[in-house]
From Swiss-Prot:
Glycan attachment residues as annotated in the record: N217, N236, N324, N345, N408, N425
Annotated GO CC locations: membrane
Family: Belongs to the glycosyl hydrolase 9 (cellulase E) family.
Pfam families to which the protein is assigned, alphabetical: Glyco_hydro_9
Catalytic residues (UniProt): D166, H513, D561, E570
Annotated GO biological process: cell wall organization; cellulose catabolic process
The protein's name: Endoglucanase 12
Extracellular-side segments: 95-623
Alphabetized GO MF terms: cellulase activity
Gene: GLU3
EC number: 3.2.1.4
Superkingdom of the source species: Eukaryota
Organism this protein belongs to: Oryza sativa subsp. japonica
Family annotation (PANTHER family): ENDO-1,4-BETA-GLUCANASE (PTHR22298)
Amino acid sequence: MYSANHWGGSFEIAADGAAEDDHSRNMDLDRGALSARQHQLDETQQSWLLGPPEAKKKDKYVDLGCVVVKRKLLWWVLWTLLAAFILIGLPVIIAKSIPKKKPHAPPPDQYTDALHKALLFFNAQKSGRLPKNNGIKWRGNSGLSDGSDLTDVKGGLVGGYYDAGDNIKFHFPLAFSMTMLSWSVIEYSAKYKAVGEYDHVRELIKWGTDYLLLTFNSSASTIDKVYSQVGIAKINGTQPDDHYCWNRPEDMAYPRPVQTAGSAPDLGGEMAAALAAASIVFRDNAAYSKKLVNGAAAVYKFARSSGRRTPYSRGNQYIEYYYNSTSYWDEYMWSAAWMYYATGNNTYITFATDPRLPKNAKAFYSILDFSVFSWDNKLPGAELLLSRLRMFLNPGYPYEESLIGYHNTTSMNMCTYFPRFGAFNFTKGGLAQFNHGKGQPLQYTVANSFLAALYADYMESVNVPGWYCGPYFMTVDDLRSFARSQVNYILGDNPKKMSYVVGYGKKYPRRLHHRGASTPHNGIKYSCTGGYKWRDTKGADPNVLVGAMVGGPDKNDQFKDARLTYAQNEPTLVGNAGLVAALVALTNSGRGAGVTAVDKNTMFSAVPPMFPATPPPPSKWKP
């Protein structure tokens, strides 16, 4: 409290200047000391609340120039990279520096082994001027004068294949054999490559198709005839021909007339199928593939000519007894399917799915024999071929209705293969009697075993586990097991414990009904009847016809290894073509993990996209 100024005047105290300055300096010093003490006090108070001060840390970051990272993270990354190099990189470097041995191919299964041999049969059946690498030492050039009297074929009809144990060239079964080989290559090219037979089988196909192109004017768009056969065999004939004589092909000295067909819906259809299928096989050779397609189109047009609908074999005594065609509607369906796949032209698939075609072919009738695939009945093969289109591409309208019918019929055909349903008889040894106990049963066995294995692979490729036979569900494995059982029978799993493929296994036929195999290759040219002693001898063949599948046993599993029992002991082109197809379908060679059972796409390489064309724009609106 301030006291009152009882004396009057100012409250200020007067002082001299020097004293004033000293006082001010002392006040500044006191403030500085007080401030210092206050700062120390603040730090002390903070220490009470926060604890003792931390020691000053080292710099935690590293400047790499382009980026700044934590020192700890940088060390962690470096150590991780070093560990990865030691664990992964170093072993890889060491492994690559070690010289590698070529990996051993997996051991071939029995089907692969038999396949190598079965293909050699075609080398032995070649006619014409043989290549140096043909591989059959006891075969030479033959048939070099075939068709030499024809004025419209330059060089004659030289080449092709002899049909069986005689020296006739039947063009109908020859064409079917080439179709079968081509189909097997299209579906299973990876397997052929894996077993080293891809180039070989293509060469065999080309040998056949080159010859087929000679049998008509393949450079023309319209033709009026085809040559259907070279060589003849008259029933009970007494004049030299291909049955009366017993000669090696190289020693033939008798007439070999050429048969001509001005009407051939069946033969023309099969030839078109063979050339069209081969054009897909040789799609990597554009010029040759185009040549095949053009030839196929010409002979297909000839086959479909409305004024040429008489079967090629009718009334011809040199054909009708051996390869008589019972219908041509199956060849129409078969060839149309192949022409569509080869060209992508919708005209062919439109015809193949026209409801009138299966009606005329009786494709949807419940006729048991129509379910058996053979050189004479293409219906089961054509139906499966068209089912392929539905299963993989599903084109829908307007083809769907007929394709469903073909697919359902294919499934029913497969049902007939199982003994439990009693459609066909089976021998006690397990062989299906597709031709009802007649001669040459094995050619039917292998053809239908191929279809069974192929259909199983189709279903597996689209993740379908099986299908219904009435109330019974049959699996893909059931179907494949049937095919295996039939082929295994042929390879030796039968009551006779013998292989029906020459050269396969330890026990196989050694007295074939085959002129070339039975007549020694000893430099002697035997006459027409001079070869009879080799026909009639009971000795084994001097030339082993490796890979030849014989006709097969009778309905009681019995087999007579005698040269004159041609129904059992004669091999044929169609038989071996079916055998090759069945073997490549069943072998596991070339099927690695993740590899589909069949080549799904090559067949469709010419087929356009399956979607409708863009509709035309609407017309202009007018009020």
